[in-house]
């Protein structure tokens, strides 16, 4: 009976695998899925499986918990302004060391141990993420993206490698800047003309009632997003995520998925099964 169920699962996945073969998918990775070893393993397994079946994968990662841990070790306080990390010169050095060094290379190694091929990159490489200092309020070395150069990413994808990208940008003056991960993932997805953008979060998806997980909105049409803002359904940390989703959809990305990163194998459950999981945002009714 168990073997039949496994076979049925594989058969169910076949049309979805065929549909996604050769497509490019950008995954924003952060939150609990990065902190817990079991969840980290399941995400890496999902990415390697997707790569094996011919999907081009770009993994854009954060690392806030690791940055906080390192700052605490050197007695630097973690400060945030409107949800964005205040990044002075000393903090920026820690951010570079942790994101582009430890976290990025750990993820590349995890993918390798699962049998995949990966290359670790950051936004400084080949001037991949060009940015200006954030203008709205004083955040130190926090950048706003003005241009993304995906030549290096495309080269890695063509060679069959998963691109693992740390969200550090560079300015015209050569200064390095901390970049919001959701914003970076959206900008990279746009420039690659990706088929999908997937955001792993610490909630089931977009919720109608913030404290009620059963109020999950499973599907949103792009033209209805403004109404959700007006109704106060999109609030707090979900605001920059949804803004990034809208920007991606308006600039060539076909679909955006907001998934619960606390659920093991949430990515392949969403992409390769009939039931799916999380919130799908798309351009129009089908």
Swiss-Prot record:
One of its GO terms (biological process) is arginine biosynthetic process via ornithine. Its main location: cytoplasm. InterPro entries: AceGlu_kinase-like_sf (IPR036393), AcgluKinase_fam (IPR004662), ArgB (IPR037528), Asp/Glu/Uridylate_kinase (IPR001048), Glu/AcGlu_kinase (IPR001057), NAGK-C (IPR041727). Substrate binds at residues 63-64, 85, 178. It is found in: Cytoplasm. One of its GO terms (molecular function) is acetylglutamate kinase activity. Keywords: Amino-acid biosynthesis, Arginine biosynthesis, ATP-binding, Cytoplasm, Kinase, Nucleotide-binding, Transferase. GO terms for cellular component: cytoplasm. Its EC number is 2.7.2.8. It catalyses: N-acetyl-L-glutamate + ATP = N-acetyl-L-glutamyl 5-phosphate + ADP. Pfam families: AA_kinase (PF00696). The record marks 28, 241 as: Transition state stabilizer. Signal peptide: none annotated. The keyword Methyltransferase does not apply. Gene3D superfamilies: Acetylglutamate kinase-like. Pathway: Amino-acid biosynthesis; L-arginine biosynthesis; N(2)-acetyl-L-ornithine from L-glutamate: step 2/4. Catalyzes the ATP-dependent phosphorylation of N-acetyl-L-glutamate. Belongs to the acetylglutamate kinase family. ArgB subfamily. This is Acetylglutamate kinase. It comes from Clostridioides difficile (strain 630). The lineage of its organism: Bacteria, Bacillati, Bacillota, Clostridia, Peptostreptococcales.
